[in-house]
């Protein structure tokens, strides 16, 4: 039986706007950190990306390794339906260019995740699992297909609006457009998800459960979600 959760929850995280067309995942991690932790990462982003080994191509597993390496006190786990690189992505325009250089690193990181203390669960996360985590523990960093992510309150249907070409990851116009967002709240009775989109300046976006699920389970996302625990004092701020 599913637990009872609060009707309306929102975490008071600090918004961080992505600086480039590839750093949405890194920007989402920054939203989960306190001011001192954020500063330690943003002092020299280029050096950080080199030291962490992902350069300007960040996969969800890279974000997990970075959190574990830089902030071992932060509790999190990662759900995905694919352990490694899906060979089918070779035919996807979004992935074809980056697979050649990332394939070995990504597969190795999955293979060594246990000994590096990265908690990965190979399964699909249900909507209720996301809601329950946000209700009780923190936020979720979610990989979505931005082409399917429609916000109720943005000036246009797309959460990228008129700036889609400049703000979307890798700047490509394809059927799949990978983009990370932070699910930071929900309204249960209205069946709405509250999230922060690093492609925008400081604002909260809102969409329906159904649209959010379509965007996060689209082919290309591997249904990747990082469940991050936060300081409880940030809840409902």
Identify the residue ranges that each predicted region occupies.
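A generic short-segment signal for beta-strand/edge and adjacent turn/coil regions
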Residues: 43-46, 108-113, 143, 193-197
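Predominantly the structural core of cysteine protease catalytic domains
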Residues: 63-64, 68-175, 226
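Short, well-structured alpha-helical interface segments that form or flank functional binding sites
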Residues: 19, 58, 62, 125, ...
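Helix N-cap and loop-to-helix transition residues
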Residues: 24, 41-42, 59, 126-127, ...
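Active-site nucleophile-adjacent alpha helix/oxyanion-hole segment immediately C-terminal to the catalytic cysteine
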Residues: 1-84, 132-136
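Generic detector of short, locally flexible boundary/turn motifs and exposed helical patches
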Residues: 5-9, 39-42, 104-109, 155-162, ...
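Noncatalytic regulatory segments and standalone regulatory/sensor domains
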Residues: 1, 134-141, 145-237
């Amino acid at each position: 039986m599913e637990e009872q959760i609060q009707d309306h929850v929102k975490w008071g995280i600090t918004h961080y706007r992505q600086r480039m067309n590839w750093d949405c995942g890194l920007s989402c991690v920054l939203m989960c950190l306190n001011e001192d932790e954020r500063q330690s990462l943003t002092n020299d982003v280029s050096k950080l990306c080199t030291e962490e080994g992902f350069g300007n191509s960040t996969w969800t597993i890279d974000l997990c390794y970075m959190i574990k390496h830089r902030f071992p006190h932060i509790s999190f786990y990662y759900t995905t339906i694919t352990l490694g690189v899906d060979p089918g992505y070779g035919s996807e325009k979004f992935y074809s260019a980056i697979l050649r250089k990332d394939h070995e690193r990504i597969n190795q990181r999955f293979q060594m995740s246990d000994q590096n203390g990265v908690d990965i669960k190979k399964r699909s996360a249900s909507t209720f699992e996301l809601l329950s985590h946000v209700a009780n523990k923190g936020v979720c960093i979610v990989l979505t297909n931005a082409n399917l992510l429609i916000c109720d309150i943005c000036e246009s249907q797309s959460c990228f609006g008129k700036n889609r070409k400049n703000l979307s990851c890798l700047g490509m116009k394809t059927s799949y457009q990978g983009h990370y967002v932070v699910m930071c709240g929900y309204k249960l009775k209205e069946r709405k998800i509250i999230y922060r989109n690093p492609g925008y300046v400081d604002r909260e976006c809102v969409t329906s459960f159904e649209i959010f699920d379509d965007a996060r389970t689209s082919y290309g996302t591997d249904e990747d979600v990082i469940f991050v625990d936060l300081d409880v004092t940030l809840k409902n701020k």
